[in-house]
């Protein structure tokens, strides 16, 4: 995609932040406007995360204008809002490739640019990393500054508050910027507040405060009186002094779209000692009315026409697994009032919006708090309810100890509906769901099911929901295959797979040809079936990763020369490893090939592209099997 840079006379001159810093401050508003226009033009033609970046235009310009990046460390939490940062740091002309195979990474990524201090993707990591960098900078003694930008959503995670608590305790020089685009914790935004922020962060006030502390430090009553006077002044127009109690110097809230006020305030705060906290209020989707009105809808967008008021509708397709899960929740809740559904801030992505509206008393969004969500569900189960935790595969990693300690050890009936299992696609390494089978399979008391289509998915949801212990149903991102769904009371037998294809015996076949049985786990069945037909192989849908269908495995091993396991999880510790362990424990001779994700992190690209690259499509499966048996 070729962009006419003549439409952006100032932005076209900015190839690195140093170019920005060489421009007069009075031009920053024009630069911000051009940057917002460029972002809109680029993402609308290529797709990508959208509304968050529109909301951080002025903040991004101000930070790169004030700080000497990349020498100074700038960290973006999660990274959805970092598109403007990428544009200003040498990646403007590649932005149209973002989230595409071989293109720019969807989030800040250390391998991509020296300006990306921390690789991110999951929320709430920025403050911890920034604190570590601040400690290292102090030891380095080169006056290197550290800044972390975190959103109000990410601030709900326990990890963020753990880091704030530590930072306030050890009091290293650092700046935390809260990008509050929800307006939920700050209403006092305007000229008076911006003026107060400049005043409280300015050298006269801070100098007076520090001098007073030194002068009056040995007179506790007077020191306390001075502190109370300062807090009274702040308290007239700012929110709670919670962050001050943690040990931070709190400034704000201020208008995050007034770039000159941002520059003035950040300049004032740059050289302050100790932990600083700046509260900035922004509008998600700023500058594009449709995104401002519906920031969730415009959080990530397909290609669209900015002149039109609606995003293009995708062509009618089969329901997604998320939709199938959401419908199952509603159907089950209609007949069982004990069902309760828990999600850590993923209602839209997990297909739970309708359920939340129809059954608000049975729905709990606990915010970005994966650890809490799991133990909260344990409490619900102990209390006699029937909890279902809807969570992405990559996010369940954060609740691992709670899964073991609070659910599995106590053998509680909590069902986990694990969405985005397997190869997710464009969000890259941080979001690929390729580890859940490996870290869950070793946990006692746990039943793990992997559906091959939407009918199997609902059967497994029905089955897991009725179990009196922990269960997991893991399903992929994407659409079903058009199967007819069962009723909500239909279940399947635990630990039993099904045979899909039986190899044809050819009398004239040479003895050198090996008979093959493919054991498919989960959504790989479609590609495995194509491979089995080409190879004249037996194919089974294993259904269960735990407990395995040991009888079926024994039968297949006895009747075939070679077994092949196929899964969209890491080979190490995955479903295939479970088959290996069982057969080796029997002491039986076996020739077995495990096909799955090898020992590396999967990059970004479409699901189809990554399956092909990993040789997890039908063509790749055939190649791997032929290579192995020959």
Curated annotation (Swiss-Prot):
The record's section on SUPFAM superfamilies has:
Thiamin diphosphate-binding fold (THDP-binding), TK C-terminal domain-like
Report the cofactor remark. Answer: Binds 1 Mg(2+) ion per subunit.
Keyword Transferase applies: yes
Instruction: Name the pathway it acts in.
Output: Metabolic intermediate biosynthesis; 1-deoxy-D-xylulose 5-phosphate biosynthesis; 1-deoxy-D-xylulose 5-phosphate from D-glyceraldehyde 3-phosphate and pyruvate: step 1/1
Q: Which residues form the signal peptide?
A: none
Cofactor(s) recorded for this entry are: Mg(2+); thiamine diphosphate
For this UniProt record, the keywords arranged alphabetically read as follows: Isoprene biosynthesis, Magnesium, Metal-binding, Thiamine biosynthesis, Thiamine pyrophosphate, Transferase
The UniProt entry, under PROSITE patterns, shows: TRANSKETOLASE_1, TRANSKETOLASE_2
- Tell me which InterPro entries the record gives: Dxylulose-5-P_synthase (IPR005477), THDP-binding (IPR029061), Transketo_C/PFOR_II (IPR009014), Transketolase-like_Pyr-bd (IPR005475), Transketolase_BS (IPR020826), Transketolase_C (IPR033248), Transketolase_CS (IPR049557)
Could you cite one Gene Ontology molecular function of this protein? 1-deoxy-D-xylulose-5-phosphate synthase activity
Q: Which positions in this protein are listed as binding Mg(2+)?
A: 152, 181
- Note one Pfam family from the annotation: Transketolase_C
NCBIfam families in UniProt? dxs, PRK05444.2-2
Biological role = Catalyzes the acyloin condensation reaction between C atoms 2 and 3 of pyruvate and glyceraldehyde 3-phosphate to yield 1-deoxy-D-xylulose-5-phosphate (DXP).
Do you know which HAMAP family this protein is assigned to? Answer: DXP_synth
Report the family membership.
Belongs to the transketolase family. DXPS subfamily.
Quote the protein name from its UniProt record.
1-deoxy-D-xylulose-5-phosphate synthase
Q: What is the lineage of its organism?
A: Bacteria, Pseudomonadati, Pseudomonadota, Gammaproteobacteria, Alteromonadales
> What's the gene?
dxs
């Amino acid at each position: 995609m070729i962009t006419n840079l003549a439409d952006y006379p100032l932005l076209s001159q900015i190839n690195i932040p140093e170019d920005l810093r060489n421009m007069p401050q009075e031009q920053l508003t024009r630069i911000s406007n051009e940057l917002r226009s460029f972002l809109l033009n680029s993402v609308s033609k290529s797709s990508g995360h959208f509304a968050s970046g529109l909301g951080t235009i002025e903040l991004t310009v101000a930070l790169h204008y004030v700080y000497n990046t990349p020498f100074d460390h700038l960290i973006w939490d999660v990274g959805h809002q970092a598109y403007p940062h990428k544009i200003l740091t040498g990646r403007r002309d590649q932005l149209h490739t973002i989230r595409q195979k071989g293109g720019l990474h969807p989030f800040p990524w250390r391998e991509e640019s020296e300006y990306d201090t921390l690789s991110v993707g999951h929320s709430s990591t920025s403050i911890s990393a920034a604190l570590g960098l601040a400690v290292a900078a102090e030891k380095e003694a080169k006056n290197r500054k550290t800044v972390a930008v975190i959103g109000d959503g990410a601030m709900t995670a326990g990890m963020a508050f753990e880091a704030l608590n530590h930072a306030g305790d050890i009091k290293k020089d650092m700046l935390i910027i809260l990008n509050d685009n929800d307006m939920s914790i700050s209403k006092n935004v305007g000229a008076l507040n911006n003026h107060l922020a400049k005043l409280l962060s300015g050298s006269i006030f801070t100098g007076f405060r520090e001098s007073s502390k030194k002068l009056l430090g040995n007179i506790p009553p007077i020191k306390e009186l001075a502190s109370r006077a300062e807090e009274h002044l702040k308290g007239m127009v700012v929110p709670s002094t919670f962050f001050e109690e943690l040990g931070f110097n709190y400034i704000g809230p201020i208008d995050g779209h007034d770039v000159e006020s941002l520059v003035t305030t950040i300049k004032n705060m740059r050289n302050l000692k100790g932990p600083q906290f700046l509260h900035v209020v922004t509008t998600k989707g700023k500058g594009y009315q449709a995104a401002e009105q519906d920031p969730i809808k415009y959080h990530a967008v397909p290609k669209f026409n900015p002149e039109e008021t609606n995003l293009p509708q995708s062509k009618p397709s089969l329901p997604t697994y998320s939709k199938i899960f959401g419908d199952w929740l509603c159907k089950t809740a209609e007949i069982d009032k004990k069902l309760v559904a828990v999600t850590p801030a993923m209602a839209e992505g997990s297909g739970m919006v309708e359920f939340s509206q129809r059954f608000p008393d049975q729905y709990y969004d606990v915010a970005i708090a994966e650890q809490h969500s799991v133990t909260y569900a344990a409490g619900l189960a102990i209390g006699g309810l029937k909890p279902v935790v809807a969570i992405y595969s990559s996010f369940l990693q954060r609740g691992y100890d709670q899964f073991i300690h609070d659910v599995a050890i106590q053998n509680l009936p909590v069902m986990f509906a694990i969405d985005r299992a397997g190869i997710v696609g464009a969000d890259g390494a941080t979001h690929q769901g390729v580890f859940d089978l490996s870290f869950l399979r070793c946990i006692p008391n746990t039943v793990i099911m992997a559906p091959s289509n939407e009918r199997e998915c609902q059967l497994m949801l029905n089955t897991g929901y009725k179990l009196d212990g922990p269960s997991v149903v893991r399903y992929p991102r994407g659409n079903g295959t058009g199967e007819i769904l069962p009723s909500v009371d239909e279940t399947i037998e635990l630990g039993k797979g099904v045979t899909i294809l039986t190899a044809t015996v050819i009398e004239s076949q040479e003895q050198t040809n090996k008979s093959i049985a493919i054991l498919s786990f989960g959504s790989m069945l479609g590609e495995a079936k194509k491979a089995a037909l080409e190879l004249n192989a037996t194919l089974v849908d294993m259904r269960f990763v735990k407990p395995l269908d040991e009888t079926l495995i024994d039968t297949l091993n006895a009747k075939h020369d070679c077994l092949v396991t196929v899964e969209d999880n890491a080979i190490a510790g995955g479903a295939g490893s479970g088959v290996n362990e069982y057969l080796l424990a029997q002491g039986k001779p076996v020739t077995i090939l495990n096909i799955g994700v090898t020992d590396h992190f999967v990059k970004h690209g479409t699901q189809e592209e990554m399956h092909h690259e990993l040789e997890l499509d039908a063509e790749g499966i055939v190649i791997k099997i032929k290579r192995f048996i020959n």
